[in-house]
Regions:
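Phosphate/nucleotide-binding beta-alpha loop and adjacent structural elements of enzyme active sites
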Residues: 1-43, 52-363
Length: 363
């Protein structure tokens, strides 16, 4: 099976053409991309930095004046520059702007790991072809196989046409999840309760939920959401903790944001920190698990390890995010099937750049 016929990854292509680069965005994603460009001897190709109109202001980023897209085009004219998008979004108006720019200039959205330091480049792909092909062989429908092939090719090239070729609607997953049986909904990475509402109201057989969220500001909103659901008859337990392979404590950043975990082997910088409990699924008092959602900021593999007994006992339907670390596209499936080889495996990607909002489903 030839998952990808790509002869070059994005970084090799940029090294070959050596054209000026305009970076779109000035956040953490841009920092990571600049670091990768530097590691590949390409930092000197950066010619400009621009932002969306509402974020320009009078400022600089890595020594470049932050411009609007229009000013960037004027400043670099008549050079044939390449745009690298350095942020993530699923907002329709942002995606429309990216598509507009892509119609006018060559544009890529580099795939860089949200957590960890392993880059999904051609070398990493070729090293892991046996595992990637094994996972492909386990996928249970044509939509999943198409999604997997396009997703791998996107990660190698940064070409967003691969993402658009594997998009599913946000409600398409309901066709997969109809097999959820009565039991507890375990929401790992519950944020402010959006997925509690989504799944509890869709699947009334889930009468009870345990929601785990580490980020303190989101947790306060989660508790308010839980109170409203409890008034409608649902039983909700909210836990302010990380999820891992064993119980204990860990240091996390106190900075506000959805990405809370700061692991020693991640690419998240530890600055101001606080101590927080780490729980496992197996340590929770959940009774029978009917559905588990894993979206735990790069700790999905560890969280699966910590849910092994529950998975063996209950065989819950599971939805597992697979976009935080480069190895997630094969390691997560292998891990689950080592525990229970009787799952059917599916994959879906909903509209977003870069390739976030991509999940495996175990049915």
């Amino acid at each position: 099976m030839n998952i990808s016929k790509t002869k070059q990854d994005l970084w090799e292509y940029l090294s070959e053409v050596r054209r000026p680069l305009a970076l779109y965005g000035t956040g953490d994603g841009a920092d990571k991309i600049i670091s990768i460009l530097e590691n590949h001897g390409l930092k000197d190709l950066i010619a400009a930095v621009f932002a969306s109109d509402g974020f320009v202001r009078e400022r600089t980023f890595h020594g470049f004046k932050v411009m609007s897209y229009g000013d960037c085009c004027k400043a670099l004219a008549p050079k044939d520059f390449i745009v690298l998008v350095c942020f993530g979004s699923s907002r329709p108006e942002v995606l429309s702007q990216v598509e507009k720019i892509a119609s006018e200039h060559e544009l890529y959205v580099p795939d860089v790991p949200v957590y960890g330091s392993i880059l999904f480049d051609r070398g990493f792909f070729e090293e892991n072809i046996p595992d990637i092909e094994e996972v492909f062989s386990h996928l249970s429908d044509d939509i999943s196989r198409n999604c997997y092939v396009n997703y791998i090719n996107y990660k190698l090239t940064g070409n967003i046409t691969y993402l658009s070729d594997c998009e599913s609607g946000p409600d398409d997953e309901f066709g997969l999840l109809d097999g959820i049986s009565e039991g507890c909904f375990v929401d790992l990475g519950a944020y402010y309760g959006d997925t509690l509402i989504r799944y509890l109201k869709k699947y009334p057989c889930l009468k009870r939920a345990v929601a785990v969220e580490p980020e303190s500001h989101s947790f306060k909103r989660l508790e308010k959401c839980a109170e409203e659901l409890e008034s409608e008859g649902f039983g909700i337990t909210c836990i302010n903790a990380l999820v891992g392979s064993s119980t204990g404590t860990e240091q996390v950043s106190t900075a506000r944001g959805r990405g809370t975990r700061a692991l020693p082997n991640s690419n998240v910088e530890l600055k101001n920190t606080r101590s927080i409990d780490v729980v496992t699924v197996d340590s929770l008092d959940i009774g029978k698990a009917g559905f588990i959602k894993f979206d735990v900021e790069g700790s999905e593999l560890a969280a699966i390890d910590g849910a092994k007994d529950t998975i063996l006992r209950d065989r819950p339907v599971m939805k597992i995010a697979c976009y935080h670390r480069s190895e997630d596209v094969f390691a997560l499936v292998k891990k689950v099937l080592e525990i229970r080889p009787d799952y059917k495996v599916y994959m879906r990607h909903t509209r977003c750049i870069p390739g976030w909002d991509t999940d495996f489903y175990f049915i």
